Amino acid sequence: VRVVPGETPGDQSDRGVRQAIDRMGLPAIIKASAGGGGKGMRLVLDVGAIDESIQAARREAVAAFGDGTLYVERLVAHPRHVEVQIVADNHGHVMHLFERDCSTQRRHQKVIEESPSPAVTPALRARMTKAAVAVARAANYRNAGTVEFLVEMDAGSDEGPFYFLEMNTRLQ
């Protein structure tokens, strides 16, 4: 299962983070490595905004999490946040409970969850639920859980690639 291309630069100086962005290309997102919930995130669309974005992301990361380590990630165009709930038992059985769309957000926090996702076609649903089951199997997971994906919805295509975000060890 793919993840969004990104890295935690070994050189965490402003220059080192800038070089990571240069390698990845724009548009990009700078994120607080210790963070979540949208804190310490900065969208970088043009070269002129890189330095200011690095400094702002680092300040917010330190203030919110006490850690200024930054992560750089490629921006996924037109994203949808789609989650698949799974259940796995002690006998190796893993099943999915289909998907829900959590794309309606405010400040990177979910506001509305919709199931089934209006953006997911039957073919994409089959690929995503198969991937969610594969994630649980690869981790030898036993319990109920939620596998989160970011789906890239390109203009003119509803079969865009999707990327693994995280797995929560509970139903959400």
Question: What is each stretch, according to the model?
Answer:
Residues 1-147, 151-172:
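N-terminal beta-alpha lobe that positions the nucleotide/phosphoryl donor
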